[in-house]
């Protein structure tokens, strides 16, 4: 580990990395005593605390369900659901990293995929939307706030990167195969940060 920011516009922070290929996922965490690598059966990731904590913490939420809950409290009491989604009561809603990990895991494992790549990409961003940080809700310094600057995913088979930015929620795609992959120069694209509103009428 070195105390060198990879981007001068972003604060120095402990980074955690998730590496996935097809159906296998690992977590890489650079720590003071070296790199720690873990298999990641959950296939989501959050920042500190370390990954083993997040994995163990899921045990506290194994009772959550997408189904309508049944009365396990007391058979003698007439307890009924009065709203949809009550099977997920207790799902943490705060903005801490540990809570966002649980929320991302629950959403990922209970959401439904689509039939097309576009539907699956859209669903991916909905899953990430369940844990995104809104500007103004988490103050880190006076006048400075943590928020989700961008979200991204990639179709590794086709070499297509998809992303959204905080102010531009339209999904943007960058296709690597439309570039010269044998070239020697780095090709960069600016993040499309400004809102892109489709005016239907």
Residue ranges of model-derived segments:
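Acidic/polar residues in short coil/turn loops that connect beta-strands
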Residues: 20-23, 31-33
């Amino acid at each position: 580990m070195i105390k060198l920011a990879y981007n001068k516009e972003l604060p120095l922070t402990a980074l955690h990395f998730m590496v996935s290929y097809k159906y296998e996922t690992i977590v890489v965490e650079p720590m003071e005593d070296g790199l720690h690598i873990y298999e990641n059966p959950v296939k989501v990731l959050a920042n500190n605390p370390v990954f083993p904590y997040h994995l163990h913490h899921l045990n506290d939420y194994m009772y959550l369900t997408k189904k309508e809950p049944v009365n396990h409290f007391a058979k003698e009491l007439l307890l009924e659901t009065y709203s949809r989604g009550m099977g997920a009561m207790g799902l943490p809603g705060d903005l801490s990293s540990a809570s966002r990990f649980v929320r991302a895991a629950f959403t990922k494992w209970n959401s439904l995929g689509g039939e097309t790549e576009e539907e699956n990409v859209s669903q991916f961003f909905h899953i990430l939307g369940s844990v995104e940080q809104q500007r103004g809700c988490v103050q880190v310094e006076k006048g400075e706030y943590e928020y989700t600057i961008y979200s991204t995913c990639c179709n590794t088979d086709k070499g297509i990167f998809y992303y959204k930015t905080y102010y531009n929620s339209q999904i943007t795609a960058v296709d690597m195969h439309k570039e010269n992959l044998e070239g020697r120069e780095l090709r960069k694209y600016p993040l499309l940060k400004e809102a892109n509103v489709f005016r239907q009428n």
